[in-house]
Amino acid sequence: MRENYETLVSVGTAELLPLSAFLSPSEPGRAVGGGSHADEGQEPAGCGDPQGGQPRHSLHLTALVQLVKEIPEFLFGEVKGAMDSPESESRGASLDGERASPEAAAAREPCPLRGLLSCLPDGPTSQPHLATTPTDSSCSSGPTGDGVQGSPLPIKTADKPWPTRKEGPGALGGEPSPPTHSPSRRKSHRGQERGTSEAGISPGNSPLQGLINCLKEILVPGPRHPETSPSFLPPLPSLGTSRLTRADLGPGSPPWAVKTEAVSGDCPLQGLLHCLKELPEAQDRHPSPSGVGNRRLQENPGAWKRGSGGPGYLLTPPPHPDLGAGGLLSVKMENSWVQSPPGPASCQPGRQPLSPSATGDTRGVPQPSWGPEAQAASASSSPLEALEACLKGIPPNGSSPSQLPPTSCSQNPQPGDSRSQKPELQPHRSHSEEATREPVLPLGLQSCVRDGPSRPLAPRGTPTSFSSSSSTDWDLDFGSPVGNQGQHPGKGSPPGSSPLQGLENCLKEIPVPVLRPAWPCSSAADRGPRRAEPRNWTADKEGLRAEACESARLGQGRGEAPTRSLHLVSPQVFTSSCVPACHQRGFKDPGATRPGVWRWLPEGSAPKPSPLHCLESALRGILPVRPLRFACVGGPSPSPSPGSSSSFSGSEGEDPRPEPDLWKPLPQERDRLPSCKPPVPLSPCPGGTPAGSSGGSPGEDPRRTEPRYCSGLGAGTAQDPCPVSQLEKRPRVSEASRGLELGHGRPRVAAKTHERLLPQGPPELPSESPPPELPPPEAAPPVLPASSLQPPCHCGKPLQQELHSLGAALAEKLDRLATALAGLAQEVATMRTQVNRLGRRPQGPGPMGQASWMWTLPRGPRWAHGPGHRHLPYWRQKGPTRPKPKILRGQGESCRAGDLQGLSRGTARRARPLPPDAPPAEPPGLHCSSSQQLLSSTPSCHAAPPAHPLLAHTGGHQSPLPPLVPAALPLQGASPPAASADADVPTSGVAPDGIPERPKEPSSLLGGVQRALQEELWGGEHRDPRWGAH
């Protein structure tokens, strides 16, 4: 202790305080740190104590905090004076570690990092030094109220962010209990630590390591540390939200991991540290981090006490369990968020702690901090400057493309890199807010976010946590840039912030939809689009809706998206607060018309669409449910709606559904345009047609998505029919009411819509281009069956029904065909028997019979030679079917190749008369008819198979045979009409023969075939005279 104390004194003060001074303050918290600044030595003991008794660890932390707080007094008679500069440093360093980070970082850096590394494995974090850092950050956040966290980390970053940070984390870890304590205590602690860090540049390593170990041990008891650390963790998330979130997602002590992640990314951590460091500076208005840190400590401590230390502290632990490792950051964020919803004052202070990462930055204090922080960021990294420049460009634009693009970028990366981008986004948004306030802040944030986020890109929790804090903070912060509402939670979502928020929300939605429910709603109303997006998050815990919402929102340009997001979050809240805001905005954006939304989209539209699509793709990959919905054009809308919020699903689903419509048929666009109120603005833009507020940009987004859905649907079902039905349905849904789709979305409307769509969808199909498609489906049942597979999709229901009806009709026709075939087979058998009889009978009749046979025979030469005799015996022996069947076969083939329609027409006419002929009469004329029958019977047999399809087409027995006969007729050279005329003539001329034939034929098919054969064989003119003669 003495050694540590001396080190602290040497580093922090010229004057050495008696060890007793340390002991006396440390005695109360002796268990925690013995000599707070021997506390490196003792803090490990204290840590042991916390480890020994998790419940007591908070007490140990408190004692340590007290000791730290009093240490500056002992070490520095000017607890606050020294604290302001040293304390800011100590804030920056959080405790020893944080202070040491700037001063002792050089010498300590390696040791503390190593110590942290050694400790980190023990700690919850997988990254040793980072783990410690998270502890420090979390602890510092709690005690320092994120001022420490932000300040210490930034200070560390400025000096030696990595090692110092790690040391700082240790100090913070020791301090976690202090979070509850007043900022002065933290300041004292920091002052001491600063002295310690300074004094312990070389010796400080061991003290810092000890402190880190103590903090690590304190944190190691995850349950305990989360209690103290959770409050810290909320600030931590702000510092290294993305990192923390990632770490949080992974390990039980995600904050450490997160912090570890941040620390592990030295450059990112450094940027974050600088940002946080300068945030305190901004608070204190001290050019040096210490000054800032001090002010921040003073301000944030209270705020953190209120927001983070008190509610945040308590809230954080529960969110921590909820979020788990990954959720820790979110929890932290939520702590600040919770704080922010509870009270803007506490929220702002809480945010300040958060602002180091994103929220605090935007806040009033963080904004000033950001100014120096921005400087630090600039100094820390050029990329941060670039980000800052982007952010600066964004705030002016409000939702300008510059802002949106960063958001888009962050959104796209969010799944992986998006984290870093997302933190950037938050910084961007913070910057947007600060752009009005102080563009520099974003740089610091960017340094933290960009550098840090890149490290934490892996964990998604970070974006979520970041998003959570960012969302709330952004809502508050971005509100401020747009309307200075950002500082107050929900004061308005600036146009510029909303796009960023939408992107952030999209990213957030991807990682963590759970934490957003409470504050996103409140912020949604306040923030409008931004909150709405967090709300989407919460509502879309699945992340599917949130994602869709976000995508739609992004596509919409945040005016519309917020509406959806709000709908998603809670239709009521959204409708009451956000819907008006969103609609106002949406109407603002699309209000002018779609152009308004499109303007926003144009601002960030170009970047948005691709990021949204990327997010969509990522979400689809991530979220199987949504992909399924997307897979089905109709399915996607219904899926989302039941999932989290009908309104969101509806609004987004509506867009997706109509989108394909827009994509595929413009008519549906029209439908959607009329159906949607925003459609007026949307009408200018087919993509936007769905709705000015919700359909517009989501239209684009969903469109892009929808085309896929359409493709899936089209592929699954007949693309034309399915898409048409979908399109029609979608327009109907939108027409029925955007409210249905937006408010009720697919959940309620899914059935209703389908019910309506089933009746309406089919009508639309006929009404629009679909009607032709519908008949073709009948003609081409295979397509319909394909689409029938997709009926699961709600949009496919109407198609499904149609397909079912078509299938039933087809089945009936097939049955008829089967029956006709059976009848034809019977008729063929009858024909054969009749032919045999006729073959015998022609002999009986004599020359007339022979003549008739000759006439019947198709080949005149045979007749001339008197092949009648031959034929008679031939017929008797073999039956005329074979020879004539050959001809008939050729004819049948020709029939198959011939015009089925024309044949069917001609044959249908003949066949119709034939059906009446039931009994096969055998008059003398029958001989001819019998031969013809034989011929026709054979063709009927041959043609029957082809006729089946024809029958399926025409649906009648007559139709199948008639097509065959007509085909033969065209081959013969007689047109179907001519054939029909010929048939009529023969019928009239040879009433006994022609008519008997028909009566003979029990089935109209046989009669029609016979007629056709007779016409073909006889030839029109020859038949007529001969028929008349006979």
Curated annotation (Swiss-Prot):
Q: Where is the composition biased (Basic and acidic residues)?
A: 157-168, 419-437, 654-674, 1019-1030
Q: Where is the composition biased (Pro residues)?
A: 760-784, 913-923
Q: Looking at the keywords, is Nucleus present?
A: no
Disulfide topology? none
List the InterPro entries hit by this protein, alphabetically. KRBA1 (IPR040095), KRBA1_rpt (IPR029317)
Q: Name one Pfam family in it.
A: KRBA1
UniProt keyword annotation of Flavoprotein present = no
Tissue specificity comment: Expressed in brain (cerebellum).
SMART domains in UniProt: KRBA1
Listed A to Z, the keywords are: Coiled coil, Phosphoprotein
Chain intervals with Gly residues compositional bias: 689-698
Q: Residue positions of the PTM Phosphoserine? A: S101, S177, S182, S184, S229, S253, S355
Regions of compositional bias (Basic residues) in chain numbering: 870-887
Q: Which domain of life is it from?
A: Eukaryota
Q: What are the coiled-coil residue ranges?
A: 799-832
Q: Where is the composition biased (Polar residues)?
A: 124-143, 397-418
Compositional bias annotation for Low complexity: 102-114, 372-389, 485-502, 642-651, 929-953, 966-984
Q: Where is this region: Disordered?
A: 27-56, 80-208, 225-255, 281-505, 634-788, 870-1030
Q: What is this protein identified as?
A: Protein KRBA1
Q: Which organism is it from?
A: Homo sapiens
